Amino acid sequence: MSKRCAITGKGPMVGNNVSHANNKTKRRFLPNLRTIRVTLEDGTTRRIKVAASTLRTMKKQSN
């Protein structure tokens, strides 16, 4: 399964866990993906994974 937004293409970022002793280990920052249903032009519905930030932007632009 791809951890990528279907609309914006946002995906995982790479960074570090940093302990109090300043030890660093690799980690991934994953996007906050939500599964939504989208109705296409031909009337069929499809489930797509969308980042929560994208959903917020879509909601703001629809009003």
Swiss-Prot record:
Biological process per Gene Ontology, one example term: translation
The entry's keywords: Ribonucleoprotein, Ribosomal protein
GO molecular function: structural constituent of ribosome
GO cellular component: ribonucleoprotein complex; ribosome
Ribosomal protein in keyword set: yes
Region (Disordered) location: 1-20
Intrachain disulfide bonds: none
Cited NCBIfam families: L28
Recorded family membership: Belongs to the bacterial ribosomal protein bL28 family.
Protein name: Large ribosomal subunit protein bL28
Species assigned in the record: Campylobacter concisus (strain 13826)
